[in-house]
């Protein structure tokens, strides 16, 4: 019996895969050549003008004031163990989950879920408690470095982005449900809300909220005071703040343990519903955990927090927590603008669910609220999540418009540093790197959630 001869080898440059690799290598080489040439050219031109290059200027004294200052935790050596324990806890939980999934051909049960929660939260919390003295709280001042100024501005940007994403999602959901309402007045009001906000530039809306709304509030002496709990004037919104006492650590740990217990109960209830058709009890046991554990911590350590009320001293209020008009205008403007787009995305996702699903749920005597929460929205999420990623990214990028209304975000403070130091290339590079990281984090998180809610085919 004659042996079959092996097929002749195809040259690398003639196979599709080989040509693809060659093309990618050539393009990458050309890109690196252009980038290195541009970098050398920039260094030469900077040297001719007597401008130093590099990031050493970040340690220089800033010398300017930032209107929105946050307390920044400055980690020391021991905090590295916190990061190690966090990564180790997540890795252990992932290994346990993968092992049980392969062994049982299904998700883990409630007991192993509790163990994973305990490991993933317990290890970092224990490490943080052991090295609690290795964290120094610092606040920016005019004598601080450029690095601390950028850190403060970055926190301001992240704060606006997070609150804007949450607020625009909640507001968009409410408007979407209003657009689908059988009530003629509510439906048309929501429709005009969407049409108006989608077709007005976001910068114009920021100007409206800042100059027309928040700058027209009364002066400090004529503030709107609601029992000392809420004070509103031209300089901002003031509310009481919580001041942690000696028992705050145990109280917060008890609250976290109660939340983890509720998650375990929800997991157990879902498993019972899948196995028997009857969900387990969650409300009363969860309420008991949420009340009993923090109450015990309160009784053991005493009052965990005290209230610091804002008090008028001189020409402004001191104490409590204050929200500046710039911050309020930026958050409200971005939230209202993006909520119009989110409303249409959510509405299209709800309408993408087959009408038979709603009719079948009603045939089971489910209330309209249950139909929306249990049947419609879970199926609509796989349509809603992908386009919502773009809207969240838009909030992060549009937050750079804060410079127009005087809010000290990352771009605004970076521009001030650029004008003082003249390090344009370095500052622009920092801008690009930070916003790229923020976008990748948002995109990665939404892609992870999209994989969780996608339709699983058998």
What function would you assign to each model-found segment?
Residues 2-458:
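Transmembrane alpha-helices and adjacent helix-loop boundaries
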């Amino acid at each position: 019996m004659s042996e079959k001869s092996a097929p002749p080898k195809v040259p690398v440059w003639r196979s599709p895969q080989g040509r693809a690799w060659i093309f990618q290598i050539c393009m990458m080489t050309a890109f690196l050549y252009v980038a290195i040439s541009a970098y050398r050219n920039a260094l030469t031109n900077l040297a001719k003008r007597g401008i130093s290059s590099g990031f050493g200027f970040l340690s220089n004294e800033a010398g300017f004031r930032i209107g929105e200052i946050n307390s920044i935790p400055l980690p020391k050596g021991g905090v590295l163990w916190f990061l190690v324990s966090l990564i180790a806890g997540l890795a252990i939980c992932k290994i346990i989950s993968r092992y049980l999934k392969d062994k049982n051909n299904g998700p883990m049960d409630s007991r192993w879920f509790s163990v994973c929660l305990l490991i993933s939260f317990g290890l970092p919390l224990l490490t943080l408690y052991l090295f609690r003295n290795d964290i120094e709280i610092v606040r920016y001042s005019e004598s601080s470095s450029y690095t601390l100024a950028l850190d403060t501005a970055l926190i301001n940007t992240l704060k606006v982005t997070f609150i804007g994403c949450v607020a625009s999602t909640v507001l968009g959901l409410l408007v979407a449900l209003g657009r689908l309402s059988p009530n003629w007045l509510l439906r048309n009001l929501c429709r005009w809300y969407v049409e108006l906000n989608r077709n007005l530039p976001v910068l114009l809306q920021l100007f409206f909220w800042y100059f027309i709304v928040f700058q027209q509030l009364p002066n400090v002496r004529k503030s709107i005071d609601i029992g000392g709990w809420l004070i509103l004037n031209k300089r901002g919104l003031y509310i009481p703040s919580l001041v942690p006492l000696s028992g705050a650590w145990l109280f917060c740990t008890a609250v976290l343990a109660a939340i983890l217990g509720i998650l375990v109960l929800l997991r157990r209830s879902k498993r019972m519903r899948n196995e028997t058709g009857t969900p387990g009890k969650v409300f009363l046991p969860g309420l008991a955990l949420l009340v009993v554990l923090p109450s015990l911590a309160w009784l053991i350590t005493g009052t965990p927090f005290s209230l610091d009320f804002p008090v008028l001293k001189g020409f402004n209020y001191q104490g409590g927590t204050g929200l500046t008009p710039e911050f309020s205008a930026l958050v409200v403007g971005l939230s209202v603008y993006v909520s119009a787009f989110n409303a249409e995305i959510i509405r299209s996702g709800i309408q993408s669910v087959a009408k038979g699903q709603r009719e079948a749920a009603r045939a089971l005597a489910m209330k309209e609220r249950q139909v929306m929460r249990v049947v419609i929205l879970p199926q609509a999420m796989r349509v809603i999540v992908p386009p919502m990623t773009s809207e969240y990214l838009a909030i992060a990028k549009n937050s750079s418009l804060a410079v127009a209304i005087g809010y000290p975000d990352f771009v605004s403070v970076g521009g001030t540093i650029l004008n003082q130091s003249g390090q344009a290339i370095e500052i622009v590079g920092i801008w690009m790197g930070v916003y790229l990281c923020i976008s990748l984090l948002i995109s990665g998180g939404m892609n992870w959630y999209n994989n969780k809610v996608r339709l699983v085919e058998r």
